[in-house]
């Protein structure tokens, strides 16, 4: 099976390697060597390590398309990767998550066949009920990612825009709110079964970087403490 993977990354080859290694080992019914990775690598914390990230990506994926922007920007990164994808569904894989157990990708794709309005299958990273999209690892249908790719406002957080919060943003997608029943499925359904681990939080605590001191809506990059 061939599928586009999209990744928004920082220049952290060790973190990226842990992420791709875990998904390569635990995703079933798909071979990453048959897939294309579309990756945006921001110049943080060290821009000169971006080539190392591409080398890591090439270990796992059959084809890698990369972008080296001059400035780090979360929304711009999403715009770039999604506007370059073209498969019916994509696997959106942020660079600092580890998959802890096997997941059958074909099983996840059958959800889109069973539910016409379905836009995203979220892999469970938290115990709460998912009624809004999160950009932790997920599978997106093209009716979602193609509507957003290239159309996100760069000074507003992409998750906020995709959730349809009221910040005066008019997106080209008429039903951008994902709170309606049938547009999000969380896998696995059992809230106690967390299959993802965030490895980015522990990394950031050990560095000189932190989140911008702004509201969630305005968070688009990291800054030095």
Indicate where each model-derived feature is located.
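Conserved donor-nucleotide/metal-binding helix-loop-beta segment in metal-dependent transferases, i.e.
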Residues: 101-125
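Cell-envelope/extracellular polymer assembly enzymes that use nucleotide-activated donors
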Residues: 2-4, 36
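Short beta-strand-to-loop acidic/aromatic patch adjacent to the donor-nucleotide binding site
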Residues: 88-98
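Conserved nucleotide-sugar donor-binding
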Residues: 86-87, 134-149
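Acidic donor-binding segment of Leloir-type glycosyltransferases
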Residues: 24-65
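Short, well-formed alpha-helical segments that are part of the catalytic scaffolds
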Residues: 12-27
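Active-site nucleotide-sugar/metal-binding loop of Leloir-type enzymes
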Residues: 79-89
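C-terminal catalytic/acceptor-binding lobe
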Residues: 18-19, 147-225
């Amino acid at each position: 099976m061939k599928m586009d993977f999209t990744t928004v990354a920082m220049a952290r080859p060790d973190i990226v390697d842990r992420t791709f290694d875990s998904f390569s080992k635990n995703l079933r019914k798909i071979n990453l060597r048959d897939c294309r990775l579309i990756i945006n690598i921001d110049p943080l914390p060290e821009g000169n390590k971006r080539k190392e990230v591409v080398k890591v990506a090439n270990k796992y994926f059959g084809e890698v398309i990369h972008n080296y922007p001059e400035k780090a920007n979360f929304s711009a990164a999403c715009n770039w990767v999604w506007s370059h994808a073209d498969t019916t569904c994509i696997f959106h894989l942020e660079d600092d998550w580890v998959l802890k157990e096997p997941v059958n990708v074909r099983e996840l794709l059958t959800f889109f066949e069973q539910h016409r309005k379905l836009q995203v299958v979220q892999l469970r990273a938290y115990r709460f009920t998912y009624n809004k999209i999160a950009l932790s690892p997920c599978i997106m249908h093209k009716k979602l990612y193609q509507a957003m790719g290239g159309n996100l406002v760069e000074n507003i957080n992409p998750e906020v825009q995709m959730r349809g919060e009221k910040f005066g943003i008019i997106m080209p997608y008429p039903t951008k709110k994902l709170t309606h029943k049938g547009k999000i499925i969380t896998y696995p359904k059992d809230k106690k079964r967390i299959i993802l681990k965030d490895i980015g939080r522990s990394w950031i605590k050990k560095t000189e970087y932190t989140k911008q001191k702004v509201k969630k809506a305005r968070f688009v990059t990291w800054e030095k403490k």
